[in-house]
Amino acid sequence: QGYYSFNEHVFMANIQSEIYGRRYTYALLMLLEYKYKDKSEWKDFGTTSIEHILPQNPKATSQWVKDFSKEQRSYYTHRIGNLCLIGRRKNSSLGNLDYQEKLKKYFEKNIGSFASSQKIYQTYPNAWTPETVKENQERVIQDLMEIFGIKSPSTIIDESTYMEQQRSVYPNAYQPWTESDDERLVALYNEGKSISELAQMFLRNRGAIKSRIRKLTGERF
């Protein structure tokens, strides 16, 4: 209680949400790294980035689009179970490769120092699918609960429940963007509308707005 009180319900809600881009995401991934790594090998990692396994903007012809529905990509992309640490600055062109190619050309060269990242690729050497990312998300949540001494889950939110919640708040959630939507979104963003204002105008959550702007303009948040 008091200054150092810890609200388990808020924490559980946060770590199950779209966590990428939040200030504490890197700290949580480093806590997982500390849990998995031999402490005698702990060192300064130097340049470190957070990478999406399922990429943020996969090509329409990619295996990612075949394996994941649009709703599944929207749900999983920015969650902690789809994130890992790499020992270099991100490379967008390599980051969008299909899983097997990405593993060989990108990750095998850049995750050598990270036990937490190695664990993912040793556990899932063949494919990254909705089933495997869900399984990894559940494992990571359980590991974080152990790290923070949470004995039983406050609330575990599954994919279908989350989508229902989103649609009840944002009626356009998971609906396709039209060409006119895109033009209007970019125009309003360039006029200086905030992400929160755009979310209200387009009846979509802030993550969806940021993701669409990123795809249309290359803007990084």
Which residue ranges define each predicted feature?
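Short, solvent-exposed alpha-helical "recognition" segments
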Residues: 159-165, 213-221
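Short, Lys/Arg-enriched anionic-surface-contact patches
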Residues: 161-183
